[in-house]
């Protein structure tokens, strides 16, 4: 995820406590983010996603593990992500760290593009993937849903994307959104 760096760039890093009591590493990429041109991408609207799932009777929700960390940085951009630790070490990210101004848009664009061919039964919202099915073409909703899940999981496997099994919901009549 990181390697030791000799980059001339450096952003400070520190830890903050998350609501669940665990710690999250945070980077102050202010100097890097200030001149960054914001990505022009649309943010998914929850009401549109919910409308696209209307009429379905079987749902699954997959939560991707550390979403940004699943995206490799472009080699030429790696030195820009260098962070200094309180101990004086300098590290650079090989994967996309949290805190980059265009990280959410970049991640969302990737997930949206990957699952676009499945948009009839998949909705994505950043690191959440919602699979929704109804009975059709002589298949029950459950049979259709199993086929949809296979397609989604195969796409994830082919693209080396991983879900947090502890946060996933499979084959439910409803899911929290």
Question: Where does each model-flagged region fall?
Answer:
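Retroelement reverse transcriptase polymerase core
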Residues: 1-177
